[in-house]
Amino acid sequence: NEFTGLLADPQTVSRFEHIVFDTAPTGHTLRLLSLPKAWSGFIETNSHGASCLGPLAGLEAQHEQYTATVQTLGDAARTTIVLVSRPESSALQEAARAGGEFRALGITNQHLVLNGVLAAPAGDDGVAQAMVARQREALRSMPEVLREVPTVAVPLMAYELTGVAALRRLSRTAEHTSLADSAASVSAAFDVGSIPGLDELVRQLEADGPGVIMMMGKGGVGKTTLAAAVAVALAHAGHRVHLSTTDPAAHLGQALGAAIPAGLQVSRIDPAAETRRYSEEVLAEAGPLEEQERALLEEDLRSPCTEEIAVFRAFARTVQEAERDFVVLDTAPTGHTLLLLDAAQSYHREVERTMGDVPEAVRRLLPRLRDPHFTKILLVTLAESTPVQEAERLQADLRRAAIEPFGWVINASLLMSGTKNPTLMQRAQGEVPYVLRVRQKLAARSWLVPWYASIPTGEQALLAMAGR
């Protein structure tokens, strides 16, 4: 609503030369804006809904404003969509997916910003050379659709881009930051070697016995690789382990490589298949409907909220296995989803409204997630401002749902890399306050995982990552 108000209101638009949004609406939201006026009254009285269309009920009067918004977004002379990505494979795939959603809606004026590109190092620093090689390989293999988009590269800065002063410095390319004594500052801050690593985390998990291990955190922080490393290490120790993902990009297969270690079962919760199965059940339960009602219910069921509920049911079935085995999940429900499900009875009412009964696995899920002996939630972050802030918000969401995280994993840290590259040395120094904040204020337990020159792939590399 606020978005359309800014974009479609002539008085607001006339006050500014440029209006910059740091986040665009999703393709699903834009599709909802183009729904016919008829949906409004139907959703208000719909007893079959399983999605988040409800809050839009009664907004029929603003339909013209929504239509104008979609038209403005599709006008290349007035709107530019800027896709922002790190020079990493997973981030580039996500940028391509988001761009495709907008193109399907006729929003084609797109640009790509590659953020954090490291310049080719002049010296022989192995860490810097490896980082440049990884970035170049990601750009070589990036989705073809992004190659057609005008692209700008923003260099990896020695300092973090937080605060007005730092943002102004970004535009002053001739300005250089003093790097004197960077290494000394890093080592003097604290003894990095005293912070436990992934090997210690695996030992703690193993000692506590079977249960659920959930990786949660911002996209792109390395949840999939960490989940794979933990699962492979536990299987290598002789335990039965089920590693599951809801990641549509199948990053888990890339992390594990071709061979699956003995004792490890790998599965994928397919959101599309689960949503299809759930939607069919809802439609069957709804019974005979008029053509318009059925069409609107079907659109209702295309909502991301429907997918959340469907995936949540599959997630509950997987968690049930942890009574006897280790179950490692590389992508858990978001804190927002868990908050929506905070009161178990609310979710039960939703299921009863759409299905008539509550599966036993679902009924027992929230108590299991709240049991610290059964479920270990690991918040994964990078030692940077935004990932730490997002993990902190996620922790607050979980706590409001009476779920206490087991600890935090700080991933891909340059502190232990041994780099002598000036830019990377200062980046390492910049990690210190975030590592200290996590360890001293945010986390009950924390572990530090170094940045790796090559992405750990396959059983041996993952075992080495876990100290086995």
Language-model regions, residue ranges each:
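Phosphate/Mg2+-binding loops and adjacent switch elements
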Residues: N1-R97, P288-T386, E390-R393
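P-loop NTPase motor core
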Residues: N1, A250-R302
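Short beta-strand "acidic-cap" motif of Rossmann-like dinucleotide-binding folds
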Residues: V20, L112, V241-T245, V328, ...
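Short acidic, glycine/serine/threonine-rich loops at helix termini
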Residues: L30-L35, A96, D124-D125, A165-A166, ...
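C-terminal lobe/tail of nucleotide-utilizing enzymes
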Residues: T69-I213, R370-F374, L382-R468
